[in-house]
Regions:
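Core segments of cupin and vicinal oxygen chelate
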Residues: 30-69
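Vicinal oxygen chelate
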Residues: 1-19, 25-34, 62, 79-105, 108-146
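Long, hydrophobic N-terminal alpha-helical segment
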Residues: 14, 18-33, 38
Length: 146
């Protein structure tokens, strides 16, 4: 992947390519929730994610070969202000699934507060934003073919 930062790596004082950690990918990300068991049910029921297992504090989930963890945080605070989507988690769907996904959200009375199909230069496609049961911002996206 190309370095898209404005500062070339060679210009960062004290950092050379040999100093970089060579990661292979992302194993999982973590989403803070008030009740990880209830949240696991939401993600399984609404987004068809697979529940792997739960402990006293965590629920481990899988979606399309990627993993995420729902962490019980009793005093969870939404990282976004109302109506904002800067901090969010995007779930990809196929083209024929996008409209069906929108209908599922509507049928479940889950409000989509933002929709766009134009103007996204990095990930062009159809994007819809909504909240999980804890107010975390989620996105469903169909990426246009390149």
């Amino acid at each position: 992947m190309e370095n898209t930062m404005n500062v070339p790596i060679r210009d960062v004082p004290g950092v050379t390519p040999k100093d970089q950690i060579r990661t292979k990918g992302i194993l999982h990300f973590t989403i803070g929730v008030r009740d990880h068991i209830a949240a696991a049910k939401f993600y399984a029921d609404v987004l068809s994610c697979n529940h792997i297992r739960s402990s006293d504090r965590y629920s481990f989930m899988e979606c399309g070969g990627s993993f995420f963890v729902l962490a019980k945080i009793p005093h969870h605070v939404n990282p976004n202000n109302p109506g904002e989507d800067a901090h969010h988690h995007a779930f990809m769907v196929d083209e024929d699934e996008f409209d069906r996904a929108m209908a599922v959200l509507k049928a479940r009375n889950i409000e989509t507060f933002k929709y766009t199909s134009e103007g996204h230069h990095t990930f062009p496609g159809r994007h819809a934003y909504f909240h999980d049961s804890d107010g975390n911002c989620l996105e469903i996206v169909y990426l246009y073919p390149k």
